[in-house]
Amino acid sequence: MFKATARYIRVQPRKARLAAGLMRNRSVVEAQQQLSFSQMKAGRCLKKVLDSAIANAESNENIKRENLCILEVRVDAGPMFKRMKSKSRGGRAPILKRTSHLTVIVGERGQ
């Protein structure tokens, strides 16, 4: 098993989970193709994390990418940046800028 993470990514976890659904239960090559054609910002971030996990497998254990499959994709909520928006009569409303922690675990088939 080879793991790669990206933390504090400025993508809402709800939207990132949609992009993560594109790569679940696929081989690494298929997932890369799916994410390369995805127009979501989260898809670009997940592709970078997937490439990092593949590089970990290739450099540490000399495993070919054709033999790898995705074992787990996890999108967790990170901390929120809190901003304020002015409202009528001197009021204000909170705006929450959400962040995500992305984790991709790849391994050999049949593992």
UniProtKB/Swiss-Prot annotation:
Swiss-Prot/TrEMBL keywords: Ribonucleoprotein, Ribosomal protein, RNA-binding, rRNA-binding
Pfam families: Ribosomal_L22 (PF00237)
Cellular component annotations (GO), alphabetically ordered: cytosolic large ribosomal subunit
GO biological process, one term: translation
Stored Gene3D superfamilies: Ribosomal protein L22/L17 (3.90.470.10)
Taxonomic superkingdom: Bacteria
Transmembrane segments: none
A single GO molecular function term of this UniProt record: rRNA binding
Keyword Ribonucleoprotein annotated: yes
Statement: the UniProt record of this protein carries the keyword rRNA-binding: yes
InterPro entries named in the record: Ribosomal_uL22, Ribosomal_uL22_bac/chlpt-type, Ribosomal_uL22_bac/org-type, Ribosomal_uL22_sf
Family membership noted in the UniProt record: Belongs to the universal ribosomal protein uL22 family.
Record function comment: This protein binds specifically to 23S rRNA; its binding is stimulated by other ribosomal proteins, e.g. L4, L17, and L20. It is important during the early stages of 50S assembly. It makes multiple contacts with different domains of the 23S rRNA in the assembled 50S subunit and ribosome. The globular domain of the protein is located near the polypeptide exit tunnel on the outside of the subunit, while an extended beta-hairpin is found that lines the wall of the exit tunnel in the center of the 70S ribosome.
Record text on subunit structure and interactions: Part of the 50S ribosomal subunit.
Protein name listed in UniProt: Large ribosomal subunit protein uL22
